[in-house]
Amino acid sequence: MFEKYFPNVDLTELWNATYETLYMTLISLLFAFVIGVILGLLLFLTSKGSLWQNKAVNSVIAAVVNIFRSIPFLILIILLLGFTKFLVGTILGPNAALPALVIGSAPFYARLVEIALREVDKGVIEAAKSMGAKTSTIIFKVLIPESMPALISGITVTAIALIGSTAIAGAIGSGGLGNLAYVEGYQSNNADVTFVATVFILIIVFIIQIIGDLITNIIDKR
C-alpha cells in the first residue's frame, strides 16, 4: 500500500533520516538547555535590582545573546564552517550541524529563561533573602522551581525551532529529513519523497509539543 502511493520513498533512507533529525535535535537541545539556563540566569541575576546587579557584565552577556540570536541560521552555518571543520573534522553529516545548532539555539533559549525568571514573584525572592538564604539556595530552591513550567514551555519552543533548523542544515549536507526532502525529493523531482519527509517533520513537531504541554501541565501547580 505504501509503495503504491509513495513509489520513490526508500523506507530505510526515511528511517535513517528520521534518526539523524532526532539525533541532531536532541544533542543540540541538551547543550542549548545547559548553556541557555546558565546565560539566562546570568542575564537575570546581573540585571538592575537583582541579586548580582552588574551593568557591565549584563551588557556584555546581553550583547552576545542578541548577536547570535539575530543571525539567520543559514548564514550562521556558513560563518561557522571553519570552526565546525576544526571541531568535528568535517562540514558534512549530522555532527557537523551540531555547533551551529547549539550556538543558534542557546541564546534563543537564554532569553526565554530570563523571561521565565522575571515572572517569579519578587515577594517570594525577598522572603527567602530575609530568611538569610544564600544566593545558591535562592537560585535552586526558589527561582528554578518557581519558573519550571515556563522553562519547560521554553525548551519545547526551542526544540520545535531546532527541528526547523535541522531541516535547513540538512538541505546543505548535514543529513536528516531536510536533506532527504531536498536531495531525494526536490532535486530528484520526487514530490512524494518531499511530502513524506514533511509529514514526518510535522509528526515530530506535534509529538514534542504534546510532550512539552503534558510535562508543563503536570508541574504547573498554579
From Swiss-Prot:
Entry's transmembrane regions: 25-45, 73-93, 97-117, 152-172, 195-215
InterPro entries membership: AA_ABC_Transporter_Permease (IPR051322), MetI-like (IPR000515), MetI-like_sf (IPR035906)
Gene Ontology biological-process annotations: D-methionine transmembrane transport
Gene3D superfamilies in the record: MetI-like
Record keywords: Amino-acid transport, Cell membrane, Membrane, Transmembrane, Transmembrane helix, Transport
Record's keyword annotation contains Transmembrane helix: yes
Domain ABC transmembrane type-1 span(s) in chain numbering: 18-212
Induction: Repressed by methionine via the S-box system.
The UniProt record lists the keyword Transmembrane helix: yes
Localization terms from the record: Cell membrane
Gene Ontology CC: plasma membrane
Topology term for the membrane: Multi-pass membrane protein
Family listed: Belongs to the binding-protein-dependent transport system permease family. CysTW subfamily.
Quaternary structure annotation from Swiss-Prot or TrEMBL: The complex is composed of two ATP-binding proteins (MetN), two transmembrane proteins (MetP) and a solute-binding protein (MetQ).
Purpose of the protein: Part of the ABC transporter complex MetNPQ involved in methionine import. Responsible for the translocation of the substrate across the membrane. It has also been shown to be involved in methionine sulfoxide transport.
Protein name: Methionine import system permease protein MetP
Natural source organism: Bacillus subtilis (strain 168)
